[in-house]
Curated annotation (Swiss-Prot):
Molecular function terms from GO: ATP binding; ATP hydrolysis activity; RNA binding; RNA helicase activity
All copies of domain Helicase C-terminal, residue ranges: 901-1076
Gene3D superfamilies, per database record: 1.20.120.1080, 3.30.160.20, P-loop containing nucleotide triphosphate hydrolases
Reactions catalysed, as given in the entry: ATP + H2O = ADP + phosphate + H(+)
Chain ranges for the short sequence motif DEIH box as given in the UniProt record: 742-745
Native organism: Arabidopsis thaliana
Comp. bias (Low complexity): 9-30
Taxon lineage: Eukaryota, Viridiplantae, Streptophyta, Embryophyta, Tracheophyta
UniProt-recorded name of the protein: DExH-box ATP-dependent RNA helicase DExH7, chloroplastic
Amino acid sequence: MAPKKKPQKQSNKAASSSSSSKSNYQKPSSGPKLQISAENEDRLRRLLLNSGRSGPSIPAPISNSLSKAQKTKKLNNVYEKLSCEGFVDDQIELALSSLRDGATFEAALDWLCLNLPSHELPVKFSTGASRFPSTGGSVGVISTSRDDWNDSTDSSVRVEEEEPAVFVRVKGKQDEEDTLSSDKSSQADWIRQYMMRQEEEELECWEDEVDGIDPRNKVSGPRPFDVIAKEYYSARSDAIKAKEKRDKRGQEQAGLAIRKLKQEISDLGLSEAMLESEFQREHAFESATEQESTCPISDNLHESVDADDVSVQMLDNLTLNTNPAESYESEEIQTKALPSSSSGQDFVASDEDSEDVELGDTFFEEIPPSEISPHELLELQKEEKMRELRSEKNLGKLDGIWKKGEAQKIPKAFLHQLCQRSGWEAPKFNKETGEGRNFSYTVSILRKASGRGKNRQAGGLVTLQLPPKDENFESIEDAQNKVAAFALHKLFSDLPVHFAITEPYASLVLIWKQEELLCTTIQSTEEDRRANFVDKLLEEDSFSLTTSSSSFENSLPLVDSYVKDKDDLGVVKSNNRAKRDSYIEAECLSLQRKQENKKRTQKYKDMLKTRTALPISEVKNGILQHLKEKDVLVVCGETGSGKTTQVPQFILDDMIDSGHGGYCNIICTQPRRIAAISVAQRVADERCESSPGLDDSLVGYQVRLESARSDKTRLLFCTTGILLRKLAGDRTLNDVTHIIVDEVHERSLLGDFLLIILKSLIEKQSCDNTSRKLKVILMSATVDADLFSRYFGHCPVITAQGRTHPVTTHFLEEIYESINYLLAPDSPAALRSDTSIKDKLGSVNDRRGKKNLVLAGWGDDYLLSEDCLNPFYVSSNYNSYSDQTQQNLKRLNEDRIDYELLEELICHIDDTCEEGAILIFLPGVAEIYMLLDMLAASYRFRGPAADWLLPLHSSIASSEQRKVFLRPPKGLRKVIAATNIAETSITIDDVVYVIDSGKHKENRYNPQKKLSSMVEDWISQANARQRTGRAGRVKPGICFSLYTRYRFEKLMRPYQVPEMLRMPLVELCLQIKLLGLGHIKPFLSRALEPPSEGAMTSAISLLHEVGAVEGDEELTPLGHHLAKLPVDVLIGKMLLYGGIFGCLSPILSIAAFLSYKSPFIYPKDEKQNVDRVKLALLSDNGVSSSDLNNNDRQSDHLLMMVAYDKWVKILQERGMKAAQRFCESKFLSSSVMRMIRDMRVQFGTLLADIGLINLPKTGEFSGRKKENLDVWFSDPTQPFNMYSQQPEVVKAILCAGLYPNIAANDKGITETTFNSLTKQGNQTKSYSAWYDGRREVHIHPSSINSNFKAFQNPFLVFLEKVETNKVYLRDTTIVSPFSILLFGGSINVHHQSGSVTIDGWLKVAAPAQTAVLFKELRLTLHSILKDLIRKPEKSGIVHNEVVKSMVHLLIEEGKPQHK
């Protein structure tokens, strides 16, 4: 069997020629070289092959709609391509058998590269080095043996012998011809094996003859041509002799034998002329032998014996009974047998016997009869074609060009003649430059187009060159003639040019023609085997399908049995249902009796009297009546109406009183955890029951990481996310009777999402006409009731009046007047004339706040103004106020919070106002702690008063949140600093005074970061009224608004923009897929106010980039886990991988900084000092986690991690004041550090919530114990921190989280991308230029990498882009190619060239075997995540052998590469 082709190694000459032709062209390198030690590679391969995966993922099978012919064509195509790449049949068939009819060329290459040992692969796949570098338009025509040829019967057999080759380069043609050329690369090997088998058969036949066995009687069927020719010669000879003797009987017998032999040769598809030609040749040969004892080889051969100069006459003799490629071997044998010092006669006399052995035995001895194979038949046909080619009958094609008898011409002259005759330009011979190429030439010919229609031949410049093996020229003339002969062969293949040109060039032309004819033989033999294999493979698949179908039919009795068993099971279930209904009925009676007994108690009567006084009680009957008639109801109650606590109780009491209490299951959603907990506790108190969740209480609550419910719970308060999680397990909510959605006016993302689901459920149950129906109640204080009513099919709306005490509102200008406040010119809240434009833009200074950074990016005009005037100041509005107040308003920067004013105002309230708690609304946690720190440091709030300075936000523990509802001792004032969490749902009874900053933080998508982040912004008028209402819940109150009346009336929005219209939809899309709600866009288009098409497309695209979904929006294992983490998907991915790869603590810190902001502050004119401090932090190896070498300094994110670790160590060892001094000395923000600690705990508990890590089993981490939980997450002995001190691992996980925020220099991008990039100038740069795939970008001056000129790797990940006069990358980290391949975008392995592209523009040079290894590692990681879904409690995943090997790879191989 013929081996498959493998490109031949190119010699140094060709390499130098190829390189020299483009020596002046500068382009990117082949990419950073990815090299793995043999030990690592072998270990990883063994692990992967033993991990339960047999190889690369098998693609989806071909559609069953394809016919067998189409499947056959596809598999044949793959087979052919693999063959051309140098794989042997056994290897190809093994791969295709594994991949079945779903095989693709790429999948088969992956399988082979992963499963075959390196030494069995074609060299270019095991080393990644292409043997023929691409030259942009070359065609290689190769006739050579493969170095590692595998016989189909024994893959261990190798034939290691180089053969001569011919190489053609035709400029302007496509590289696709390279594949065709490689088909010829191993023909000589095949021929050699074939000849060896022929010799064995000859020996057998010789033995048979010795034993007296007639070979003609031994076998039946077609016989070889040579046997027939021999008999034909014998019959003709007999006929001649009989004619001479006038023996008529002998003539008749000979004639009959001749006719039979002619019929036999005709049956073989050969012409009778071949027999006659053979007879004439043998007859002439015999006559010549009788006349003189000389060799049949022409004397011309002996005059010039050279491997390249073989005469036509010699070719006639040598190629008669063999294929062309064998002639190379014959030449070598013949040359060795000819001593250069002897004449031809001497040679014949001395080596005749040797020649008989070496040549005669192989080519001239008779071949005994045997069965003719299709290959042998084709071989004979090729011999006939070669005879025809050498026949003088072809001379007619040269009419008008050359006649027999005319002097032969040198190839140069004849080529010139033919070009002139064709109307082409004269050939031009170009000397090739390079070492060792003194006589190397190419020939270029400019051809004109000719012909029309289908026969039209395109013109153009064609350049041809001989391969290196033919470049041993005697002279310039010889070099030019050889390449001219080659041009004659290629360009005038229809003409017998060998007749018209001189030797040795005529023989070379014949050799080249023989090589072309040989391809058909090899291809035909291969096609037979391939066709049989593909047919068998498809038949097996068909049989498998038939068997499956048969098995299914045979299993019908089992199915019937199963149905019968199921029917029996149904009877059991029916009995169980009857018992359950009986139990519920008893429960209904029990609840009814308890309710009646409770109503008789005085405590309940007093509480009921208080409840009845609430305004919502006036519409109680209307609410209950509407719920009996309709499935959806909107309840609109103003602040203080009591709707949140009373409506759920109305429904519960009504069902209990009507005897249906046992069936009642009410779920009331709240937008925040604190609201769910506090409302549940209040309702339990009003019902005179025990605390929520106890057995004698019907009320319970459930929030993330905290639950208080039991089997007796009939009214559950929970967050929206908890209900959505319940929907994931029970999409019909069959056991729920009522769902109450409170505070729908907030239009939160999850709230609107829940409404879509509820609407679908209501519509479905209306169609099903079920007896038990779900009831939905929407409640809000301020709401566009008609909007919700229309959305739910014009459902009824009930409005209840509010009951609040009067509240007096003082705006900013009035506060200035009342406390006689002076805004200092150097106050942070004041605009200053000495503020530079750079400072106003705030491109670096994070102290100006996140909102200001965003505004700076938007280019607010007022920040660029050189005067000190507040752009929102309208002088006519303040004519009645003092000059001091007007000056304050003129220089006020309204985007900054004036903490000095806040402190003075709080002191003013404490001094002049009656008792009552103060509630201060601030935008975020950092602002809360900044204010509380200022107050705690003041004389007024020292001692016991400091205990009543209380924060209130979603991040603090529930026990700490509950303290805000307690009353302080007499003489002490409670001061609560809160986020907008206190706007709705919760009521703090003793709050009388409200200070409203007018700010809050919204979650917005930052397109530069490709992250969602909290952005500070102004609240709406509706929010402002809600905050004001908090002051009048128990008695008349006062609201101090820290914004002007003009802003409230003219600049604030009436309502908040729904989150679905302003937030990224990525997390929402994940929930849609997790709940199995169909395709994303159709589902979201049913929203109350659908998001834009662009927003949905962007979200889906990001999910694909992150790897959360694939294909037709199919949720991946990674996406399944991300859907359970209520964080940005990039942060979630980083957290997941941080836990899996054992470096959680540093990743918690980095994720927190990415979600919040950098801890570094930049005082004016202190940038150099800050940079120096940064380097000092990285250089100090005193902290274990900062054990970094010089190369690991190239990371802003590792710097943040080190800063936090140092801060928290000082905090634990020396206390808060020492930690504060550390921050001041290192230009760090203490408030940011505290926020990072809280976020670390929050992120860690999220991972514990999904089962990725384990939390301590003892103790509840609340209050001061939160610090202990952060210590737990930092514990290096925990499995999730096993590799937390390995910077290479941390940076790899960082890459996983930040990708696709990546940039590369010219060494890491593809040539196509590099040529299409927008670059800034062409001058030579002294710095390393970076690109983001579209344009040149620059590292921001605030990054630690901005001062480096050399980088360990050509890739970096970044947090965000900032565009001014240039595009800057903020917060960068240099990452290794290993990280990109493991955690980057989609990878495309270029097996042949030994390179990998990532997302189509990044590149890495890697051998095919190594690249496929990384591809498989990705799939294995995919499987690990999938396994984690099935076993979420499997927290020891970091001990997985594949994960450990990947970590080892990152640590050992990811070190700096010296280039």
